[in-house]
Amino acid sequence: MRNECKHIVAVAALAMAGLMAAASAQAQVSAQGDSTIVVEKPNYVTIALETTVNKPVADVWKRIGGYCTISEWLQIAAGCKILSGTDNEVGAVRSVGGEVLVGKTQYSYTYTQTVRAGRPYNLYHGTIEARPLTATTTKLIYTLIYDNSMLPDDAAREKDKASRTAVFTRALSNMKTLAEGGTLPPPPNQPARGQ
């Protein structure tokens, strides 16, 4: 009888330990959040654009590589301000799209757009890079990646990609013009100054 009691107590203790371990593991999973993927079938799109600039890489980057210089080459009338963080440093947030600087090298940076309430998150990231080709020429590369799976169909996805490609092709052309010391034409759909 005494041995039976010891056996029952031992089994009960093991069962209790097992239950406590399971509860602890479940609590850890809950603390880490749900691991369910939000976008079941993402459709990642990459747009890679490039142009050659007739200036040395250091001169090109000095002219167009500032994080808020986007307002010049994208011709944003409202301009650009750093909302938080330090300008040109990882973690800086600019007023253009609420974009966060998430990576940088001597002649490149990568940014992302933040999640917005009520809007599907498309994981949008952009990278601007300047690479020396020769001592006097530079290749500018602008790469975008984003998920367009939330768009209704292939036609909408193609239209979206074509629109982004047009905007950033113009932006890259504007960067080249500025880096080479030129003056930008008026933005599309806006009259020239003085008209």
Name each model feature, range by range.
Residues 116-170, 188:
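Beta-strand/loop substructures that line and gate deep hydrophobic ligand-binding cavities in soluble
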Residues 23-81, 194-195:
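Hydrophobic ligand-binding cavity/cleft-lining segments
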Residues 11-21:
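Bacterial N-terminal signal peptides
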Residues 1-12:
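Bacterial N-terminal signal peptides that target proteins for export
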Residues 54-58, 101-107, 129-139:
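A short, structured loop/turn motif at beta-sheet edges
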Residues 52, 69-72, 79-125, 174-189, ...:
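Glycine-rich portal/gate segments that line the openings of hydrophobic small-molecule binding cavities
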Residues 58, 62-68, 166-173, 177:
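Solvent-exposed, polar/charged alpha-helical surfaces in well-ordered, non-transmembrane soluble domains
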Residues 58, 62, 155, 159, ...:
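Surface-exposed, polar/charged faces of alpha-helical domains
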